[in-house]
Amino acid sequence: MEMCNFAVESADTVFMEVIYEDNHIVVVNKAPGEIVQGDKTGDEPLVETLRRWIKEKYNKPGNVFCGVVHRLDRPVGGLVVFAKTSKALSRLNEMFRNGEVHKTYWALSRNLPELPEGELKGYIRTIEKTNKSLYYASPREGAKEARLRYKVLGSLDRYHLIEVELLTGRKHQIRVQLASVGCPIKGDLKYGDKRSNPDGSISLIARHIEFVHPVSKQRISLDAPVPDDPLWKAAESLKQ
């Protein structure tokens, strides 16, 4: 097992921070604004940057395998797992489907939920044309069940740090479910916050991931550093 934490410069991405790497997987701290897979913008996705990095680092001829296991929304930062082998990709996909990967997110909101911790249950339907998810308290045609657990970790003068554990994986789930209880994420104009963040991000990060390695069977437990921002640094101190 090789633990690493360093930045990789490329022509199209300011940096790529590798948190963990071995022969089968790579875990990257995605910066807000980056895309994991290609989209209609034509911007280079993180998977391609990583593929080029692997090719150059190990002087690999020909095509390099790099499989996308899961994604984060463009304005969200934090941990993303990639597979370096087809065996790892197949097993990780199965683990994600079976709920065997534990992911924890941190969010900043101007508002507090009614209870300091709890579980949110509802239904989400995604409108692809507008790239937005709609939330319903009861079942609706075309909507899928969405569940998460949350806990308020602490409060600053104007913002509150909320820890979220996803129990299902729906598009924009954390964003829409926190907004449904009056707690839109800081900077998330799409789901009800009133002011954007200067860098276009929203104040949501994939903070922690834990799973059994798909090949070695060792337990992997990783944390993403919080963004280099005074508000996030202050929020992080609430947990210490």
Regions found by a protein language model. Name each.
Residues M1-Q240:
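RNA pseudouridine synthases
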